[in-house]
Amino acid sequence: MKNILLFFSLIALPLAGCEQVIDYELEQGTEKIVIEGLVTDQPGPYTVRVSRTLGYLQNGRTPGIADAEVTNSDDKGHSEVLQAKGEGIYQTSELVGTIGNTYFFKVKVNGQEYTSQSYLKPVSILDSVTYKFKEKNAETDEGYYATIYFQEPKGKGDYYRFNIWVNEEPEDDIVAINDEVYDGNYGDPEIDISLKKGDKLRVEMLSLDRAGYDFLRVLGTMQYYTGGPFDAPPSNAPSNISNGAIGYFGASAVTIINSTVK
């Protein structure tokens, strides 16, 4: 067995530029296709990255596949073949993410076909941020802690992912929640990051379908796996892609709020 570090960037927006590092345990010599893609209701273009685990690079980023055929479509009859941009990146030119649409993608590599789909659910609006100062204790560092607010719609089955930046630097933590606590109520999750006066906070909340939520929950487990005597890493790499590929293809609506600690 060997461990392979894979850098996943799919769950960040194109403007985000942050990556998640996932440690996969694969059989020696095993090759896996890795596919990463995200469609949002923000202006495109959107990208899909296609790579393979065998022969991974020194920095852990999997080598891109240059000769894949990548198609993205929706349930309204729109379809386009993505343009190759190098290093395994394939980019849309006309696709526009729309709430309520289901998006499909198909990747062909060496005669093998890999598919997935995702429904673009609406997202609640982040309407405000407050800060509370906390003294240092056994569980928290001294500083200001942000609480964000949004009206969660009634009806269970909503899922969300948060991307967080402090002073334009992305935070690494994977934060995904469901609506079990907030269903139909005013959501007020606290961000567990110590801030100081003058810090600039940016929070993006992305809607997820159930497959996206499950994927991120497993990613979070893998990210925080410590290797202790009572811990065990997940036996399977997370994926919502057919035919044994690793990775995730998703569709998300996005809401953004910016704030400064005063």
What residue ranges belong to the model's regions?
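Positively charged n-region of N-terminal signal peptides that target proteins for export
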Residues: 1-4, 20
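Sec-dependent signal peptide hydrophobic core
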Residues: 5-9
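C-terminal motif of bacterial Sec signal peptides marking the signal peptidase cleavage site
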Residues: 14-17
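A sequence/structural signal for flexible, mid-protein segments enriched
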Residues: 19-262
